[in-house]
Amino acid sequence: MLESIPPILRPESVEPVALKNFAEKFNLEVVGDPEGVLLTGISMNTGDLRPGDLFVAMPGKKTHGANFVAKALELGAVAIVTDQAGLDLIGVSQVPVLILENPRAHLGDLAAFVYGNVPGNLPKLFATTGTNGKTSTSYLLEGILRQLGEVTGLTSTAERHIAGEVIVSRLTTPESPEMQALIARMREKGVTSVAVEVSAQALSQLRVDGMHFDVVGFTNLSHDHLDDYEDMQEYLEAKLPLFTKKRADRGVVCLDTVYGKAFVKQSEIPVVTITSQMGVDADWHVGITAETPAYTSFVLAGPNGVNIRSRVPLLGAHMAANAGLAIVMLIEAGFSAERIQAAIQNGIEAYLPGRTERVTGATGPDVYVDFGHSPDAFLNTLAAVRKVTEGRVFMVFGADGDRDASKRPAMARVAAEGSDVLIITDHHPRFEDPASIRKALFDSAVEARPNLEIYEVSPPEAAIRKAVSMAKPGDAILWAGPGHQDYRDIRGVRTPYSARAEARAALKENGWA
């Protein structure tokens, strides 16, 4: 069974844009007659195209979008934007063709204009980037905004939120036509503040072009995505454009990794700094006051003696650091520390699907399902679990196929060093041999801790059952990798699958209800 793909979210009503005005706005050459042509949407993908759309035909990795113009016209496209190469492929067109070299570089601005997302007509926009913590920070930011009385929107790896409506996500950061349509839908629903999770890939592919954020935040940078970027320096440089005058007014940088200083040094916009580390010089400091399996209490200390106390409904000091970053971003946006303290004095109200999510029953071992899939994520989460666990710590994990393989040895090493019992299983093998992935992880784990109790169990539903069958009350199980995801990718087929549901079922089968 294939995973259903959520539809593109668009505003329910759009003020049509005259193609003639559109062409004049962007100074585009028009082949054909634009007179009387009205645009009600924009798409770069025929799978999302609707009647009245402007179809943007761009060169791709394998083929040119101009090869899909016939399909676009069948679906109701009323005009085409393409480059000279695309025009040559199209030949004689039934609809007007607008010539624009490098359409992708302008796609965000084109989409913003079509959907009426112009300065003075937008909600407050917040963006968070980093290797780990950007989803959590975005959810916490949205939660605090809601407690402050804002009507909120969210776009993240896990979900999209529009004034309380929840929709499954397709990408961490959607392509710019989808993003602009989403923002327009949020405006239509009265959203006043939006938290946006921004990946390095989104910045490299210009998906947030056409957007200008009130405040942007940086969480951290660690080993990941080196299948997309040559090295850590290139990965860093992919994220830096979020801290430019083109994209934001102000920034908040976490100094918990060495790359934070690079952001401060290279930022084009004013930034303030935050840390949860002792001995690090920063404007704001996060200190932990209590940790339990259900929540982490903290104090955020800042300039002029400001102290904000609250708790986050998640396990781990790293989650408190994410909450601190979210709070400082709000202060930089103009919300007063006093108002924020009053709103969150009894805790931050947010549900983060698959982020150290505790799926434990009333009895039995604590079981956490987490999305973390990098060495640094493993390190932080294992440390947090260890701190609140009296008994043994079990870890269940696998590695993504057809993704950055260079991080696998470090993932296995951290997993081995941080657990008492390690169970290696499958994650998304994609087109790789899952047995080969497991063997590589197993070998690295054994090398790190030769005497550790290590098992190789496939498929993952058997792996979690193995862990639960071995665990006792007082023990904890961390299943790292699947998090919120509701599928497994096996040879290009996304099969419905929920790690959280499997974990709950395993607990029930073992009498831990």
Which functions belong to the PLM regions below?
Residues 1-109, 113, 258, 285-290, ...:
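N-terminal leader/targeting and accessory segments in enzymes
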Residues 1-28, 51-54, 64-67, 305, ...:
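ATP-dependent carboxylate-amine ligase
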Residues 22, 53, 72, 110, ...:
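Residue-level signal for inorganic ion chemistry
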Residues 23, 88-92, 213-367, 443-450, ...:
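Acidic, Mg2+-coordinating active-site environments of NTP-dependent enzymes
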Residues 41-43, 76-83, 196, 251-255, ...:
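Short, hydrophobic beta-strand segments that form beta-sheet elements in well-ordered domains
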Residues 54, 79, 215, 250, ...:
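Well-ordered beta-strand positions
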Residues 74, 78-84, 252-255, 396-397, ...:
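Short internal beta-strands
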Residues 106-255, 261-268, 389, 511:
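Phosphate-binding loop of NTP-binding sites
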